[in-house]
Curated annotation (Swiss-Prot):
The lineage of its organism: Bacteria, Pseudomonadati, Pseudomonadota, Betaproteobacteria, Burkholderiales. Residues 60-64 are annotated as: G2. Its EC number is 3.6.5.3. Monomer. Keywords: Cytoplasm, Elongation factor, GTP-binding, Hydrolase, Magnesium, Metal-binding, Nucleotide-binding, Protein biosynthesis. GTP binds at residues 19-26, 81-85, 136-139. GTP hydrolase that promotes the GTP-dependent binding of aminoacyl-tRNA to the A-site of ribosomes during protein biosynthesis. Residues 81-84 are annotated as: G3. This is Elongation factor Tu. One of its GO terms (cellular component) is cytosol.
Amino acid sequence: MAKSKFERTKPHVNVGTIGHVDHGKTTLTAAITTVLSSKFGGEAKAYDQIDAAPEEKARGITINTAHVEYETANRHYAHVDCPGHADYVKNMITGAAQMDGAILVVSAADGPMPQTREHILLARQVGVPYIIVFLNKCDMVDDAELLELVEMEVRELLSKYDFPGDDTPIIKGSAKLALEGDKGELGEGAILKLAEALDTYIPTPERAVDGAFLMPVEDVFSISGRGTVVTGRVERGIIKVGEEIEIVGLKPTLKTTCTGVEMFRKLLDQGQAGDNVGILLRGTKREEVERGQVLCKPGSIKPHTHFTAEVYVLSKDEGGRHTPFFNNYRPQFYFRTTDVTGAIELPKDKEMVMPGDNVSITVKLIAPIAMEEGLRFAIREGGRTVGAGVVAKIIE
């Protein structure tokens, strides 16, 4: 069966469901596809199709994730749903499924639970910019005051982790009713309200090509008579011949000019996000540039050595460590294209970190890396991956 061509007529947004186990994330995911497919086209997915999420590997870590797609009047959405709590932790930290916004599912019958809190914290740490709340199972709560109380609790919890709790859209409904075809305001009505909230509350994400130019350096060659060529894949933005660029990371920042862009042995006037290119640098010596640095628009990204991060430590079964690690553990941190050694400082209340844990840490690298909050990295020991992380806050 031929795959239908992906029509990119509507802007594309990535979302996902988060929240405590059994609060109805997967049922809601099924309900959204069912209601929206009948209204705007697309494919309805049954609960068990989503629940049997296939295994994927991201940075060597096995994650179960279900991917569904749906459309609203204005947009095309790609939506991820994970069966288990551990899958969420891994997914959010590795950035396997980058989210432009999340739908936090909270059971009105139970209120916020430990994983509700943990997922909000994770969303904050890994830089999920927007959260919309679906207050599920409202058909099981007769008491309007109780509903108000749960809503208030959720808003307070969001505010506690620096999300705008007072302004967050909270949609009351029942995913089960909607999935069963109930046309009332808790059923289909709630799903349509949720779709509207997604469209209006989550802004259309900036496309990679619109960002400030950034390219991780993969290789450096000198071509006699022409100068130094740096190769890599443009991560974001556009580079045009004649533009100034900076070389950032590992060594003091250098300024240079792009004098040529090559792709598949052809000369171009520009390279853009997604292109694998060679960039010719004016007056730069071969030994002044190395793998692990980045080429970027001047002033757009700075080198840092000291930061806090949220990390997931691989379990033994995933090929990770067999033993815990302690304060001042010094592994390699693999950023983009290179390893840099760094020392880990654990939180005051944590004596050690076990394989399979996730934890907030502070890291000091021995050499600076071009860094922004939200940058992903792997933690390695002798070339094998033992963890994955994301920069939460830059200290210096």
